[in-house]
Amino acid sequence: MSSPPSRRSSGADPLRLERSIPAEALDAIRAPFLSAGAAPVDAPVLQPLGLLLDLAGEAMRSRLFVVSGDGGEEACLRPDFTVAVARQHLSSGAASGRYLYEGKAFRVAPRGSDRAEEFLQIGVEAFEAADPVAADAEIAALAWAGAAAGGRDDLTLLLGDVGLFAAFVDSLDLTPPLGARLKRTFSRPRQLKAELEGDAAPAAATERSRIAALLAGLPEAEAAAVLQELWSLAGIEPVGGRRPAEIAHRLVEKAEVVKAGRLSANQADKVRAFLAVSDAPEAALDAIAALAGPNRAPLDAAIEGWRKRLAGMVAGGVPAERLVLNAAFGRAFGYYDGYLFEVRSAALGEERPVAAGGRYDGLPARLGSETKTGAVGCMVRPARAYAGGGE
């Protein structure tokens, strides 16, 4: 037995449902997905809470409906299907697979919002070693076809790419620790702002710490042992219940931030200019290419891949004039590690995407897979796609 789901942010009211849509409209929206060559799958509604938070980030907790089991373990109602389907694929032992799902997902609406909290999604998740650029184009075109089948004439396909930002950062020829740190901030606006303003590396405070500098070159277990020995020699007992390993970890982190360095003013300006790019894709790619640093080969390769991806989308039926590439576009779910997109309606606004998807090649490994394969998928919200609906 499990306790009822707890509402993280809006009291104990029943889940807010979305509007139903006519059967013929749902059939039209579903049709492109039925022709995508995917096997139907029924993913479990309950998913491990800890796993979702590890993958999506602690900030996602407030959007999840949590269920506590008799054994004390916590689960949540699936907020989407990607992780649930990926787990099923891995448990099957298949080297590759393409799956079609249709079912309800659940998210707590933001306080004061009228968004539905239980809503229908139709989608495809593909775990294949095929050409990733071609697969990306196919999946984006599939999402567009499903979204457009609802009859809306105000749709835009917004594109972004975590990998494009990574390639741009590589072009700047930063120290490896600084480059890695900057890449991690892409979907964390406050941390990114701190990097750009030079607040992420408080040199004056940490460079004075000789202990931190000493520990920085040691493995963490060894650093903890050294710290424990120093305390013993000085007759000091740590306060607050913090263990030597925890304190050593924080000291090492601080020292490594200093060693990694900061962005120069010119580099920070380039990053700001990159993040400001939002235009028709070809113009956006030209603007990004003009910002490349001295090590431009990775960025040039990423841009060439994007030109092929765009050609594939247009060939797959996406109108070129409906495409927008936004260099700063990211998603709340931290497991997306490549290109990503949303189909947006002008009438519904950016907070209510009609369809969404992207590439998450790293997710299977994070779920325990030892086989490296591509992973990409998309979903559509039929109630939003339907021209006579909305939520």
Spans of model-derived segments:
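Positively charged, Gly/Ser-enriched RNA/tRNA-binding surfaces
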Residues: 2-4, 18-37, 41, 47-48, ...
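Glycine-/proline-rich flexible loop or hinge segments
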Residues: 9-16, 61-74, 122-127
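Polyanion/phosphate-binding surface patch
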Residues: 44-75, 115
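Proline- and acidic/polar-enriched loop/turn elements at helix boundaries
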Residues: 45-46, 159, 181, 325
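Short low-complexity, flexible loop/linker segments enriched in glycine and/or proline
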Residues: 55-59, 171-173, 339-341
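Acidic, His- and aromatic-enriched active-site or binding-groove loops in soluble protein domains
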Residues: 61-71, 173-207
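Electropositive, surface-exposed helix/loop patches at the edges of structured domains
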Residues: 74-94, 191-205
